[in-house]
UniProtKB/Swiss-Prot annotation:
It comes from Pseudomonas syringae pv. syringae (strain B728a). The keyword Amino-acid biosynthesis does not apply. S-adenosyl-L-methionine binds at E74, E99, D126, D149. Residues 1-24 are annotated as: Disordered. This is tRNA (guanine-N(7)-)-methyltransferase. Keywords: Methyltransferase, S-adenosyl-L-methionine, Transferase, tRNA processing. The lineage of its organism: Bacteria, Pseudomonadati, Pseudomonadota, Gammaproteobacteria, Pseudomonadales.
Length: 244
């Protein structure tokens, strides 16, 4: 019979009377993926040029980009198609992408290199850490969260990234007038996002009916989304503006 009081070998021992360290529930699962030649090129050549690392103090992004410009941060950019298209279409804007999966990071950076873009920077780590440690308060014009994992099962809802605490964190990083733009293709998650954001302090829903906005022209349609539309699947966009 195993002694239930023996600490896990990978965990530090906790003395009697001590509190166990709080482990934040993560909204993502690391998945292994095979790298294409282009993705590997993006990592090898692009990451040293355009990759950013976690810091203990907020980053001066004006210095990073060499200018002061409207600034967008996207969490979980996947393979980078939307972020790449948006950055190419708006060279007067600066874009910061955050993604934990290496093939996606490599794909985005390969595109950045191929197109010669200079207005994109990338973090390949946990977005919550990036927001907490690297992004100054009141510094973002827009934060985008497109098609995050909906965590369908009820027991996994706590893993959804959109939570009251996350809404407050995003608000602290947005400028007044800045926008938190979300999109999902899972109806129940759209309702959940709307419920969380509608009661989050300091935001205004930009939808005229306080529900969902029509698909904004600036958000590119992905191949996945086009396929879903043909099958009759819906997509819901939410835009909440920081008002104070």
């Amino acid at each position: 019979m195993t002694d239930s009081h023996v600490p896990h070998p990978e965990s530090p021992a906790v003395e009697e009377g001590e509190e166990r360290p709080h482990r934040r529930i993560k909204s993502f699962v690391m998945r292994a993926g095979r790298m294409t030649e282009g993705q590997q090129r993006g990592l090898d050549q692009g990451l040293p040029l355009y990759g950013l690392s976690l810091t203990d103090t907020p980053v001066d992004f004006d210095q990073v980009f060499g200018r002061s410009a409207p600034r967008t941060l996207e969490i979980g950019f996947g393979m980078g198609h939307s972020l790449l298209e948006m950055a190419a279409a708006a060279p007067e804007h600066d874009f910061i992408g955050v993604e934990v999966h290496s093939p996606g990071v490599g794909a985005l950076l390969n595109g950045v290199l191929t197109q010669g873009l200079t207005n994109v920077r990338v973090y390949d780590c946990d977005a919550i850490e990036v927001l907490n440690r690297c992004v100054a308060d009141n510094s973002l014009d827009r934060l985008m969260l497109f098609f995050p994992d909906p965590w369908h099962k009820s027991r996994h809802h706590k893993r959804r990234i959109v939570q009251p605490e996350f809404a407050a964190l995003v608000r602290s990083k947005l400028k007044v007038g800045g926008v938190f733009h979300m999109a999902t293709d899972w109806g129940p998650y759209a309702e959940y996002m709307l419920e969380v954001m509608s009661v989050a302090p300091g935001y205004r829903n930009q939808a005229e009916d306080n529900q969902y906005v029509p698909r904004p022209a600036e958000r590119p349609i992905t191949k996945f989304e086009r396929r879903g539309e043909k099958l009759g699947h819906g997509v819901w966009d939410l835009k909440f503006e920081k008002v104070d």
